[in-house]
A protein has these predicted regions:
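Active-site diphosphate/adenylate-binding microenvironment
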Residues: 1, 99-176, 181-182
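Generic structural signal for well-ordered, non-membrane alpha-helical segments
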Residues: 11-18, 67-71, 75, 90-97, ...
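Thiamine diphosphate
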Residues: 18, 59-60, 68, 75-76, ...
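Structural motif
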Residues: 23, 138, 189-191
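Glycine-rich, N-terminal phosphate-binding loop of Rossmann-like dinucleotide-binding domains
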Residues: 27-28, 143, 194
Length: 289
């Protein structure tokens, strides 16, 4: 569960580097709420921004010096200019970042392992999806703890594309986006990764996928509701407002009873989907292949 929305879905290494940086080079980003931890990520009082973006509106955000250009070509030009000017990274800084990266990788590997006797966790699910992805595959996430886990634990691979949409949490984007990716001609597997709360907001897009004959893989995580928002509400207000799939408690009159027994696989099957249930990393790998 998340505690609030003032944190960013980056690795710990990247977050600490951003906290100290006096210059941020923003490449193709809208510097939105989730990316910047609601603008709390950058702690240096003298921080300045340079933004490379094809969209002029986004290029000016945070008072950045805008470079309206293709990201790859702009970076090539900047690298040539930096070399010509004699710009070099500080040796001490490189050592510091290397140590932070090593520490983060150790944490990520631990988060990706399933603990014996415990339910399949978000970190393990995101790690398995990343490990099973092959060149040509597309992974889509857009909201909640799935979005954060996918972003933090993904390992870059040639030809594997992550499409993560999060100006704010964008529940219901995932399945529709997966259909769009398939219709656009992507040849590999297309995986939509979402929680049960987001799934229940728009499961009928499975019917659209069926109608269009678009083969997609939908990984629905049983979170018993909107746990990211639950965490935010508990942190900010000290109580939640019915964001978990619980029965109403007769004494308190609140939705604080037992978790509801909901069969999401049966729901998806009723709309034409082939379904598998996975309670372990091994079962999830098998379902994905």
């Amino acid at each position: 569960r998340s505690s609030a929305h003032n944190w960013a879905p980056s690795s710990g290494c990247a977050a600490r580097a951003a906290e100290k940086a006096d210059l941020i080079l923003a490449v193709g980003t809208r510097l939105s709420d989730c990316v910047t931890g609601s603008q709390s990520l950058f702690r240096n009082p003298d921080v300045q921004f340079i933004s490379i973006n094809v969209c002029g509106h986004d290029g000016f955000k945070n008072g950045a010096l805008p470079i309206t250009a293709d990201a790859r070509e702009a970076l090539k030009s900047l690298l040539r200019a930096a070399k010509a000017a004699g710009v070099k990274p500080r040796t001490g800084y490189l050592r510091e970042i290397a140590a932070e990266r090593k520490s983060w990788r150790a944490k990520a590997e631990k988060a990706g392992r399933q603990v014996r006797g415990k339910p399949l966790g978000q970190g393990t699910i995101a790690t398995v999806i990343s490990e099973e992805a092959q060149a040509g595959d597309t992974i889509i996430a857009a909201a909640g703890t799935q979005l954060m886990a996918a972003h933090k634990l993904a390992v870059s691979k040639p030809g594997v594309e992550y499409q993560i949409e999060f100006g704010y949490s964008c529940m219901t984007h995932e399945i529709a986006a997966a259909i769009g990716v398939r219709l656009a001609g992507r040849k590999g597997e297309v995986i939509a990764y979402l929680g049960d709360g987001g799934y229940m907001m728009n499961p009928t897009e499975l019917v659209t996928a069926y109608q269009e004959g678009t083969k997609i893989t939908v990984v629905v995580v049983e979170n018993h509701g909107f746990q990211s928002i639950y965490g935010l509400q508990m942190a900010r207000a000290g109580r939640d407002f019915g964001n978990e799939f619980r029965a109403r408690d007769r004494q308190s009159k609140r939705l604080a009873g037992e978790y509801l027994e909901l069969d999401f696989a049966a729901n998806a099957a009723s709309m034409g989907a082939l379904t598998w249930r996975a309670a372990s990393a091994t079962e999830l790998r098998s379902a994905l292949t």
